[in-house]
Amino acid sequence: MAGFNTGVAYSKLFNVVDPKVLEPKKEDLQGRKMFKVNTLADPWALTYEWSWKEIMGQSSGYADRATDITVTDVSYHKEIGYIAERTAAFEYSQADLERANTGGRNIDIVTDRAVATHDALANWEDALIFNGNGDDRHPIYGLTTDANKAGYQTIDDPSVTLQKVVDPTNENAFSDAYKIVNYFMDAAAKITMLPGYHNVKPYLALAPKEYDLLTRPLVNQYNPDKTLWNMIQRGGNNGENVFAGIRPITELEAQYWNNKTGKDGKKDMAIVYLDTPDVAQIQVAMEPRRYGQAVASADNGLSYKQMYIERTGGLSVKFPAGIVQLAGLNDGSEKWAKSKADAKAERAKKEN
């Protein structure tokens, strides 16, 4: 590499790095797959506000000259949400560039570090949306926050796990499958039975392992292609789907939120929810952006460091009852559903 052109290096920072860092890719941001984004007018706001109304009163009978006629009333309640911020920095030097492109190496170190910076901010945003900030003074609740604290609905664990239902050795697969189907329908009904929500259809989000199990074939010689997915999305309500959609969300795996020990600490979570702004939305004050200017460091201008910043309120939950936490779909034993080949071999072994 003949020399180091600081002008070229500086332009790389913005022509190559910025598109990687600043573009909020939806496939990388799990929370944005589930909820819509609301951008605040003030990027440096410390808080944001919203109001909800409480309607009281009822009609009454009337008699001539009656004076005890009931009066209705509407009260407006103001809520305050908090904004959190996080920064991530990107740096590279002449030595980095030369080392990455000599000795038979051809490494795009600029792009790789830009992606790492993007991922750092994206991971923080998702952690805030799903886990909250754990700050008692300025709380931001996440989807996996304790339901009693956040006000979410819950449902008792199902009587069977998804692993058991789809296990090829399960001779009662269809009977167990209907238990799971009814469990999901009961979870959806927690929302659809609320006043004013009878005609809505919630979404289901669950960990990728459980999502995969929904697509595994059930043991049945007459319907070999039958799956839990078919039954959930073709069952009840005259053949209509139970959910508006089913989404695999990595952040719902136990390793990202579950602080318990033993088997309980390996149980994943699922969420049944509405994605409308009246229930919840992601409050963004400032999308990832450059913070300040990249200035050449003291080593004769041979390296640059640029900081990026994001400011967000995480998930603003306005109607907690529109979110239902589900647990117990896996038992934490780490036992995976056996393949058909394994099950067949096991049966043959027993027969011999």
Residue ranges, per PLM feature:
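Sequence/fold signature of self-assembling virion shell proteins
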Residues: M1-T47, S51-W52, T215-N352
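Long, hydrophobic/aromatic-enriched structural stretches that serve as scaffold segments
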Residues: L29-N106
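A general structural signal for short secondary-structure junctions and capping/turn motifs
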Residues: I80, L194-G196, A296-S297
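Helix N-cap / beta->alpha transition motif
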Residues: E91-A95, L206-K209, F319
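Alpha-helical scaffold segments that mediate packing/assembly in large oligomeric complexes
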Residues: S93-N182
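Hydrophobic, Leu/Ile/Phe/Ala-enriched alpha-helical segments that form helix-helix packing faces
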Residues: L121, E125-L128, F184-P195, I232-G236
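Extended, solvent-exposed, turn-rich assembly/linker loops in the middle of proteins
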Residues: T144-L228
